[in-house]
Structures are given as C-alpha cells and as structure tokens.
Amino acid sequence: MSVENPIDQTDLTFFTNEEGHSLLSRFKSTLKDTQLFDALVGYFRASGFYQLYDALEPVEKIRILVGLSIDRDSYDMMQYHQELGMIDYESHQRTKKKYQGNLKEEIENSDENDNRLEIGIRKFIEFLKADCQDPVIDKAFNGNGKKLEIRAYPSKNIHAKVYIGKFKPEDRDYGFVITGSSNFSESGFVANREFNVELRSKRDVLFAENQFNTL
C-alpha cells in the first residue's frame, strides 16, 4: 500500500536525487561560498569528482577521509595483500599515490565513451598538487599546505557519509552538514535514489567539525 502526502517542493533540507532535489545541485549552490570542505565517505570515485570539481574550484581547503569497506581478511586473499595490508595506517603521501593509481585504473576499465573520468582524474591530481590559497586556515587544521588532502581512515568499520562545509567569516551562516546515504560518486550525487539531510545550525556544524578533526 502506498500513501503519498503532499510535500513542499521548495524544501532545501532533504535531498533524494529526485528531480529538483539532487545532492549535486545543492553542493553547487552552497560550495561557492564555502572556505573549508570536508568529506568522510565509504568510498571515493572519479565520477563524483568530475561532477563536483567546478564547484570545488573556489574552495580554499578540501579534506577527504575515505573508509575502505573491504576488511583485512579479504585483503589476505588478494595477491597484492602486502601492499594493501598497510592501508589503514597510510600517510597522506602513500594514500595520495594509491588513489591516483586507483583512479587511473577506473578510467582504463570504464565503459564510458566520453572523457568525464579522464577530466575527473586530471582535476583530482591537479587539486592534490595545488597549494592551499590560505596558509592560515591550512595551518589551523594541521594541513599539508595543499588545496586537497586525502587519507584512508584508520579503521575497517567506517560507513559514514558526511559532508561538512565552513563558510567564509563574512557569511551570515557558519556552515552546513549534509549526512545520509550518498557516497562521493556520480551515483551518490545524481543517479541513485538517496536520502540525505542538511543541518545548518552552528552547533551541529561545530559538532561534526570536531568529530572530523579527531580522526
């Protein structure tokens, strides 16, 4: 049995990727005013970076923590287990190299006929190499001096999908938190039916920010 209640189509709290309510559209709207953007996700795909890179261009600092969903026992069954056995404890430099390799493999194995994945990979690597525009904010968050940092989270149990944006000081709002079902991918941002909610109170954003900074 299906019962549908009337909803406000202008609601900007929930994002399901239905028409007019895609997570990608919301990011494109809010990231233009964002100074610091953090993402804690189960997995990362070049397709997602392609969808978002233009909106991320003006963001001064981007930090991505990726939780690997495959467990240690599964790694042991793989031929390259020795390389992946340290993934839970990789430094930024090793993680960066690993994900660059994974993204190149993704484009080689893709059936897509266009160059979207190639652009996503190129922009991803470009952001990794670019200097952070604001050394002060980079130092405040113990950054490495670059626009984009990516690390593997040191736990095999992480399933969170959380996106945190901190606005520029002159903005009337502090920032936003979006959490729900969407991973950092085209499917999560546009294609799949998802369920995400955005929180705007400073208290919620600070809580999420503090949790992220402890990882």
Each PLM stretch: what is its role?
Residues 1-215:
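PLD/PLD-like phosphodiesterase catalytic module centered on the HKD motif
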